Amino acid sequence: MGTLIPEETLAMIGQRLSEPVTGTITSRDAQRFALAAGDRNPLYFDEAAARAAGYRTTLVPPVLLAWALNPPRPLDDLRADGLYRGEGKRVTLNVKRVMFGGEEWEFLEPVFAGDTITSETRLKSLEEKSGGSGPFVLQMTETTYTNQDGAVVARAVGRSIAR
């Protein structure tokens, strides 16, 4: 094998795929997300309930981290690989298509309304494999979410399948 992953792409493993993105998550953002998801947990809406539970203020629904730091942009700005034009390094593979293969999250610390979060995504691994319909590449990325105090609050490992 080895024909689907160019050498220069292998050299990208461990590198950052784009500049870090930083944003502050407001209570309004958190509450709107929770309502849209049908999650009426009082810890997202009621500061007194959050304090009674031992938190400093209301919490943020954990998966909101994936969306809160990326402002909406026109569909025409998207590249074929799902990234916006002018953003990030392209992971070049000798394949025709790439599809989402799942994502695993690890939530390490609570995120609070008003926290400023920075996300950073790196290419974790590239592995050429053989499947029933031929060779493919399993691509793994790792996104780390850090709060304003430098604490890592979450980590997401994403998988893409390229063939």
Q: What do the predicted segments below correspond to?
A:
Residues M1-S18, F100-R163:
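HotDog/MaoC-like acyl-thioester-processing domains
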